[in-house]
């Protein structure tokens, strides 16, 4: 649909970048936005950079002050738990 806007913030591997480039270049879709790519970091010669109907951003999904604080507090609690002989929360490979 030529008015469609495609957004990918999942994984770069779920999109065929060559097909997305063609769809954008030939106006099969109106616009796209992504923060993930087939190859990361994205090479400077990626043809998507030539297009003006795509917004590309670096993949920074959790880079907020709140996230940094939560990760720091969680990590500190895990260390405290282990030092006190307790199993850490969310231990996935026990």
Question: Can you describe what each PLM-predicted range is?
Answer:
Residues 3-94:
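Rossmann-like dinucleotide-binding domain for NAD(H)/NADP(H)
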């Amino acid at each position: 649909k030529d008015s469609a806007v495609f957004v990918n913030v999942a994984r770069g591997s779920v999109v065929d970048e060559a097909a997305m480039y063609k769809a954008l270049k030939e106006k099969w879709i109106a616009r796209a936005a992504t923060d993930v790519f087939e190859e990361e970091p994205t090479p400077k010669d990626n043809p998507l950079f030539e297009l003006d109907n795509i917004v590309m951003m670096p993949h920074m999904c959790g880079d907020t002050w709140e996230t940094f604080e939560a990760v720091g507090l969680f990590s500190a609690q895990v260390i405290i738990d282990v030092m006190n002989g307790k199993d850490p929360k969310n231990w996935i490979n026990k």
